[in-house]
Design a protein with these regions (language model features):
Chain C
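A short amphipathic helical element positioned immediately N-terminal to and/or at the very start
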Residues: 1-9
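C-terminal membrane-exit region of the final transmembrane helix in multipass inner-membrane proteins
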Residues: 3, 337-366
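Hydrophobic alpha-helical transmembrane segments of multi-pass inner-membrane transport and secretion
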Residues: 12-39, 243-279, 300-309
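Hydrophobic, regular-secondary-structure patches
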Residues: 26-106
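Transmembrane alpha-helical interface segments in multi-pass membrane proteins
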Residues: 29, 277-322, 336-344
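Membrane interfacial helix motifs at helix-loop boundaries and amphipathic/re-entrant anchors
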Residues: 35-45, 49, 62-64, 230-250, ...
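Hydrophobic secondary-structure segments that place a key small or acidic residue at a functional site
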Residues: 90-93, 98-187
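Mechanotransmission and gating elements of multispan inner-membrane complexes involved in transport
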Residues: 153, 162-255
């Protein structure tokens, strides 16, 4: 095949092109992976807990950690019609000692059997009594049977279950009972007069939709903001700014991929014009030339893709991002389709150039070589 | 450069052999030639006769496999590529068959390219370029790009470029192959006028017998071997 | 007459693919750099400004300002350690601020301080008065306004501006220790601290004392109840700082490498087209070095022009981004990107060197 022979004879050119495109694809994939891992690390715990409506204090700006509700407000929320189950939810970052090391964890306290408990466990069982806890397992800091105490002392918590994809604010999460939460907070700050919950986790009564319930709670209790779980996840602090920043970065990277692929295949085609014209003049159909070009494009993009995926796997293992990077195959597939699709669009111009070649130009050309 | 009393070009038993695998091609076979300090010599032969190879060797573009090449007293046959580059910069001028002007430079700038690569005085070079343009009747076209010039005008710029570095020897490859008879005659007249005016020597390679009367002497070359044709 | 520059001027469209790609890559680099700097400054401003070489935390707080507690007795112990010149208490609380006339609340970090940080005046005379970080202007805050903080809407009034004092991406508000305690009591009754208890201590060392040694001495004197570190260590220990730096730098370095590859590819293709001209140049006496110098010159010019256009692009993008996205452009980062781009461009052009050297002047005549 003429197309692959040309590549074999000019490895530097095509190597550089595949390398550049591969690196750019890697940038897109890596940033995509970073984005989805980051978003999940911010809000995974929220997504995994059972309350489909979350009620925060209204000055908390949709921020669970900034929210604090007095017990009478919790009562008011619980008595709004349409509420199936309601329970206080405590959220706080604490320093704990695990395996002899001090690490920061997001502690989430919920009453056993009530909304706020993690819904999906990877192993073990939920926390049913004080002194038990379920940990998110990404950072491998916790295993079933481990004992965890706050750095300030206080009663220990035994890990009875593990869950995944449940980090909060880019920290490992520990799901405990609300009583355990309260006692750990008191142990950390003996000056505190009381421990108030951060939010109320609510499951609507049968037949009531979460959005409708959230609106009624908002109307009935003015000091709170009620969000559906989806809204809470989307509105959590850091989510929209992260998405905004990455949107800019990803857009720029994807546009560069398309441009580089398109431009450089165009240049390669223009440089071959003499040879291509000759081929047309001796009877090669236009479709043959276009097919050759597309074969090269597919080959180059294929190599680039391999480079990109290889680098992605290396980078997710090697770079210290502080959060567990999980490659999301679905997002990766979508990114690949977008990148390859745009690259092919870029190449369209080169294809048009090939189709435009007029075989008559082979005759009367002042010589294939020379400058003018 | 001043006039040297010695020959502008001396070839002694020059031989050029190309090897590809086991096969050997002899492009030039023991050619000997002497060109006087202000002499014009025409080299005539069919394509493949080795005349272009001989021209390249004379101008320091190729090194011979065997033999001596002496240009205006410099024995260049043993020069390394770097020294050959300096030699070409200072001592010879070329007029190429396919004109080879830089497409994005004006006529004047195409002349100045030659002195750009040397450490010559910029003002003097510019004055020299303008003078050449006048002699070649190109003053009006000095600021035109090659695509704005006619075929004959482009050829004249190429001729001017060959003289920019005040060479001892000018080597001209098929100057009329792309031009009709009338234009070809005009260009040859111009070349001869310039060569005579500066007392430079010239070797002109051509397959066009109609142009040989411009030269002082014509030599034939066939299959790499130089012979004498009738002198003019 | 410089050949390289003439070609750039007379045939600019020839260089469009490389320039356009580099413009976008510059935009990417400046945006990445701007995000990294914005995140860093927004997270660490308050700590970087603190006076003194050391910061003392409670040892069970894992270097978290918010979870650290230092009582009056410990503070007294710290003050007595040899090598300690001055000690100041610092406390903070993170909450939302309602701004008059604005629908959205701003996230703020209210600090109570004894010793003024760099760029911040001495604590305001009256309780309830604070200085505000200039970043809050983007949220509509004005001098003289009264902000309502926390769920109980505790009022504080803005009496002046300070800059680069944000903490954990929340706008810095700076008031006396009384103001801080009152706001804490109002907004977070479950986190109040006894009078005389601070969260961290800022410690200045006497002239000639080694800060690292003094830090160790402090922690020994308190029986291990404190953890004292240098200010820069404390800054780097803020959540996410080192990880942001390594992640962003990995992406930035990759992007620079892409720029080098794009330039390399471009000049390889350009050199192929120029083989004819270069052979002629060599025939009339140009050396490979002279020709290659032209290539490098063009690579540098392309990098410079692309950087300038790319910088405009980045500034435009920056203007369109909402204030919640911590994007900060700085001259030093811009200079870094410019220099990096020129270096990468030069390296990329070097890939064509062998090709230029291999061009045989004899081909001009055949």
């Amino acid at each position: 095949m003429l197309a692959s022979r040309e590549i074999r004879r000019a490895p530097v050119r095509f190597g550089l092109l595949a390398g550049a495109i591969g690196l750019l694809m890697f940038l897109v994939f890596f940033q995509q992976t970073l984005l989805s891992s980051l978003l999940n690390s911010f809000t995974g715990a929220l997504q995994n807990q059972s309350g489909t409506v979350l009620v925060y204090s209204s000055e908390a700006r949709d921020n669970l950690e900034a929210s604090v509700l007095s017990p009478d407000i919790v009562g008011k929320v619980a008595s709004v019609p349409g509420v199936g189950q309601a329970a206080p939810l405590g959220a706080a970052t604490m320093t704990v000692l695990a395996k002899g090391q001090q690490i920061d964890v997001a502690m989430i306290g919920a009453e056993p059997g009530k909304p706020g408990q993690p819904t999906k466990l990877t192993s073990g069982r939920p926390a049913t009594a004080p002194g038990q806890g379920v940990a998110s397992s990404e950072t491998k800091s916790f295993a079933i049977g481990d004992t965890v105490t706050t750095a300030a002392g206080g009663s220990p918590v035994t890990i009875v279950g593990l869950t995944a994809q449940s980090q909060f604010n880019v920290q490992p999460t520990l799901f405990v009972t609300f009583d355990t939460f309260t006692s750990m907070r008191k142990a950390a700050n003996p000056n505190a007069k009381m421990v108030w919950p951060s939010a109320v986790a609510v499951i609507p009564a049968t037949g009531v939709r979460p959005k409708a319930l959230a609106d009624s709670i908002d109307a009935a209790v003015p000091q709170v903001t009620a969000l559906t779980r989806t809204e809470a996840v989307a509105g959590a602090p850091g989510v929209s700014s992260t998405q905004g920043s990455f949107a800019v970065l990803l857009t720029l990277a994807v546009v560069v991929v398309a441009l580089v692929t398109g431009f450089f295949f165009l240049i390669l085609t223009v440089q071959k014009t003499a040879a291509l014209t000759l081929l047309r003049a001796v009877g090669a159909p236009a479709s043959y030339l276009v097919r050759g070009l597309l074969q090269q494009v597919v080959l180059v993009l294929g190599v680039a893709l391999l480079v990109a995926v290889g680098l992605l796997v290396t980078a997710t293992a090697a770079v210290n991002t502080g959060l567990p990077l999980t490659i999301d195959p679905r997002a990766l597939a979508i990114s690949t389709v977008v990148v390859v699709g745009l690259s092919l669009l870029g190449v369209a111009f080169a294809v048009w150039r090939v189709l435009r070649i007029d075989p008559f130009q082979a005759v009367g050309r002042p010589g294939l070589g020379g400058i003018e | 450069m001043g006039h040297h009393r010695e020959a502008a070009l001396k070839l002694e038993n020059v031989r050029k052999v190309y090897r590809s695998g086991d096969a050997e091609t002899v492009a030039v076979d023991r050619a000997s030639l002497e060109v006087g300090p202000a002499e014009i010599v025409a080299l005539v032969g069919p394509s493949g006769s080795g005349k272009t190879t001989l021209l390249s060797i004379s101008g320091g573009l190729l090194s011979p496999s065997q033999g001596r090449v002496v240009v205006a007293g410099d024995e260049i046959s043993g020069y390394d590529p770097k020294r050959l580059t300096r030699f070409r910069r200072e001592s010879v001028g070329f007029v190429f068959q396919s004109v080879n002007l830089v497409p994005f430079l004006t006529a004047r700038e195409n002349l100045l390219v030659v002195t750009d690569f040397s450490r010559r005085d910029k003002k003097k070079s510019k004055a020299r370029a303008d003078q050449l343009l006048t002699e070649l009747r190109l003053e009006e076209r000095a600021d035109n790009l090659p695509r704005q010039l006619s075929g004959g005008e482009r050829q004249r710029v190429a001729v001017g470029r060959a003289f920019m570095n005040q060479p001892d020897l000018v080597l001209i490859d098929e100057p009329t192959s792309a031009l009709d008879t009338k234009l070809g005659e005009q260009v040859m007249e111009l070349i001869v006028t310039e060569v005579r005016a500066r007392g430079t020597a010239a070797v002109i390679v051509t397959h066009d017998m109609r142009m040989t009367h411009f030269a002082d002497r014509t030599l034939a070359i066939v299959d790499g071997i130089l012979g004498d044709a009738a002198t003019s | 007459m410089k050949l390289a520059l003439l070609e750039l001027r007379r045939r600019p469209w020839r260089f469009a693919p490389a320039v356009i790609a580099l413009v976008l890559l510059t935009g990417l680099l400046l945006t990445l750099g701007g995000l990294l700097d914005g995140l860093y400054n927004g997270f660490t401003g308050a700590l970087r400004a603190q006076p003194g070489a050391l910061l003392t935390y409670a040892s069970d707080a894992n270097l978290s300002v918010i979870r650290s507690r230092i009582d009056a007795a410990t503070t007294a112990q710290v003050e007595r350690v040899p090598g300690v010149e001055q000690v100041g208490g610092l406390g903070t609380v993170l909450l939302g601020a309602k701004i008059p006339g604005q629908a959205t609340e701003a996230s703020v970090a209210l600090f109570g301080y004894q010793r003024a940080p760099g760029g911040v005046p001495a604590p305001p005379d009256k309780a309830g008065q604070v200085y505000a970080d200039t970043s809050l202007k983007a949220y509509g805050v004005q001098e003289g306004q009264t902000l309502l903080l926390g769920p109980q809407r505790y009022p504080v009034s803005i009496v002046g501006w300070v800059s680069d004092t944000n903490f954990l991406l929340q706008g810095g508000l700076w008031g006396g220790l009384d103001t801080w305690r009152q706001v804490l009591g109002s907004a977070r009754p479950d986190q109040v601290l006894a009078s005389g208890t601070y969260q961290v201590l800022t410690v200045s060392t006497t002239a000639g004392a080694d800060p690292a040694w003094v830090a160790g001495a402090i922690d020994a004197a308190t029986g291990g109840r404190t953890q004292t570190v240098t200010r820069s260590f404390a800054v780097d220990s803020l959540p996410g700082i080192t990880q942001q730096r390594s992640t962003f730098n990995a992406i930035i370095d990759t992007t620079f490498f892409v720029a080098a590859l794009v330039v390399a590819l471009f000049f390889v293709l350009l050199t192929i087209e120029r083989v004819g001209i270069y052979a002629v140049f060599k025939a009339v006496g140009a050396s490979s070095g002279q020709l290659f110098a032209q290539v490098v010159l063009q690579a540098v010019m392309i990098a410079v022009v692309s950087f300038m256009v790319g910088a405009l692009l980045a500034l435009t993008v920056g203007r369109l981004i909402p204030p919640q996205v911590p994007l900060q452009f700085s001259a030093s980062r811009a200079l870094q990107v410019a220099v990096g781009l020129v270096v990468m461009s030069t390296l990329g052009s070097a890939v064509s060197l062998r090709r230029v050297v291999r061009i045989d002047p004899a081909t001009a005549i055949s």
